[in-house]
Amino acid sequence: MKILVPATSANLGPGFDCLGLSLKLFNETQIQKSGVFSISIGGEGSDNIFLKKNNIFVNIFYEIYEKLSGKKDNFRFIFQNNIPLSRGLGSSSAVIVGAIASAYYMSGFKVEKECILDEALIYENHPDNIAPATLGGFVCSLVEKNKVYSIKKEIDKDLAAVVVIPNLAMSTEQSRQALAKNLSFNDAVFNLSHASFLTACFLEKKYEFLKFASQDKLHEINRMKNLPELFEVQKFALENKALMSTLSGSGSSFFSLAFKDDALALAKKIQTKFKDFRVQYLEFDDNGFEIC
């Protein structure tokens, strides 16, 4: 079997831990039953020995597979990782979702996306990345009694993303330590209103309001202080036809959304100005993970 799992960008400014969308940048994993266990890694993380010795995908896969099938089989895993690691593009969610869905498939169980999403919550306790990685599109999610509830909206084909990827790894745990311990009532109301309005903008295609709807007072500023150049990236993107520009997940990547006609030019301009960063033009994925 082969499974493709997309990269994701979460939070989208004010939608902390509840909003996310799916990008056409995929981790690809092939799994075959084998007489002996083996693992091969290409792309991102291919030079990381730890990923071979203690691979999270493999660990979760075997845990779920043995629980479902009652068997202890050996498998050959071939990874082609295209999602940058620890850059705020959902690399850990792609691993979790991919491992669970693969285990269900190889165990002979029906792969139901709602079931996969609830199972993924065991390994990642916020749904902002795992939901779009599973469902695709723009997704608003919440957790109620250990169950994920999500509403998905397909993203217009005339929109595209420009993702700026610094050479700075940043784990979610590390990034959360930078968050303020207390929040004022006014700032809480600010984020609630902006996250709600941002969601409505995607649902009703009111893209002209995204620039101010995507503002945040909860997490972005504190996280971006780890890499001050990101403030310049955001300002530059918004001055050059980005409809919105936000920290991607916990960082360090930065996500901008624009009309396709503007996005490619924006990517080139950002790459010219910020030569030390990797810049990618990406379209949006509306399917979530796919088993081939």
UniProtKB/Swiss-Prot annotation:
ATP binds at residues 84-94. Pathway: Amino-acid biosynthesis; L-threonine biosynthesis; L-threonine from L-aspartate: step 4/5. GO terms for cellular component: cytoplasm. Keywords: Amino-acid biosynthesis, ATP-binding, Cytoplasm, Kinase, Nucleotide-binding, Threonine biosynthesis, Transferase. Transmembrane segments: none annotated. One of its GO terms (molecular function) is ATP binding. GO terms for biological process: threonine biosynthetic process. Its EC number is 2.7.1.39. It is found in: Cytoplasm. Its main location: cytoplasm. It catalyses: L-homoserine + ATP = O-phospho-L-homoserine + ADP + H(+). It comes from the Bacteria. It is an enzyme of class 2 (transferase). Disulfide bonds: none annotated. The keyword ATP-binding applies. Belongs to the GHMP kinase family. Homoserine kinase subfamily. Catalyzes the ATP-dependent phosphorylation of L-homoserine to L-homoserine phosphate. HAMAP family: Homoser_kinase. This is Homoserine kinase. It comes from Campylobacter jejuni subsp. jejuni serotype O:2 (strain ATCC 700819 / NCTC 11168).
